[in-house]
Amino acid sequence: WENRLRFGLEVLERIKETISIPVIVRLSADEIFPKGLKLDDMIRLSVALEQKGVDAIHVSSGSVCETPPWYFQHMSISKGKTWEFAAKIKSKVTIPVIAVGQINEKHDPEKILKDGLADVVAIGRPLIADPDFVGKVLGDIRSPIRPCACCLEGCIGGVRSGQGLMCVVNPEVGKEEKKLEKISKPRKVAVVGGGLAGMEAALVLRERGHLVTLFEKKTLGGLFNLAYRAPRKANLEKFKKYFVDEVTEKIDVIFEEAHPDKLMKNYETVILATGSLPKTPSIPGLKEWHWAEILEPDKTPKNKRGVIVGGGFIGAEIAEVLVKNGNDVTIIKRSEEIAPRMEVMSRNFLLKSLKELKVKIVTGADVVRKKGGTLYLSIDGKEGRIENVDFVVYTKGMIPENSMENRLKEKAELFLVGDCKEVGRAMDAIHSAYECALSV
């Protein structure tokens, strides 16, 4: 053990001899893989570091190579686990211990300090999602915190893809030079659709001074109301709730279907945020099918045999939920990859789960027809079949729902945002709505 520590401790001694500022060591309390460093090792290390004059210990978890979801505190990791590691180390040292990881709600810092889990909290991604996070926690700024979803899609994903730092919930990140300017001549604006794009557009328009009315025929949140029902995505409900609460408080919402004639008569500008619809299957004999609405608890079958047509992330996540409800599920997919466009850490968790659940996946295949309870397939040019099928879920993409566009575009200033313009991710919907609202 002493030999393992020697190099690091000698470097530390030299640093302490050279500088007079505090030295903080960040360490992973548990790397969460079989041959990785464990909590007992890191407690011993922390004690040794204190003896060598380290001023504080900053406690994270995971390994960037072996267990990145823990290292980056992905939403699939239970909140507070790393705080517990910090508390274990704190109980063995007298120097300050710093906790980190998913500290993204107003009560989190107070809980960590009050419960004695750590002496200091460190905050990273929540400041990307909401730069005023600290002021709101302290009560100096009295408005709701825009919560980091811990999804890693904009921040880590943006950097990895070469697009630069972004954020799903905060479209201003990376665009700080664009000022949200107040409008000199407010317009009466109707936003049609209360999904993520519609809510973001309405809030930004209102902040700029426009007179905004939002029309929603069902419930605020749109299709995103299904997103957090997928495995390991419960965190997304907080992010949706933030938008719904903000819109409910600040925007005039009319819960009814918008009619083009009334929109043209009563509003100067119309923003369509009507989202998208699932593609309709053209499979002979298939008269009834499901889409992601099957994730709603009262609509999820149990102990049945089902086939999912399409192996993108929506189809794959639905498969996981259905199997966990006792269903025998087969995914039919034309290409070889499952969920190829999914955020990488979420995808790795998903693929691991599908493997553990022994979900049957047939690639290179198409459904040719359905007759009775039998689905007939074409598998690499050969015929196959699945018998005794109780239900079919069709998840082969979405199409924009912009049926009002033609009636409105000739008589009103019209903008399209979100999926009704181009089907994309939650980040695409929010960012396109933000950009549009700045231009009105």
Language-model segments: residues:
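Hydrophobic Val/Ile/Leu positions in short beta-strands of Rossmann-like dinucleotide-binding domains
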Residues: 191, 214, 308-309, 331
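A conserved FAD-binding loop/helix module that cradles the flavin
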Residues: 318, 342-343, 417-440
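Rossmann-like dinucleotide-binding cores of NAD(P)H-dependent redox enzymes
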Residues: 211-250, 321-367
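Glycine-/small-residue-rich beta->alpha transition segments that form the dinucleotide
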Residues: 267-269, 273-279, 389-401
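A conserved short coil-to-beta-strand element within the FAD-binding core of flavoproteins
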Residues: 254-264, 277, 363-374
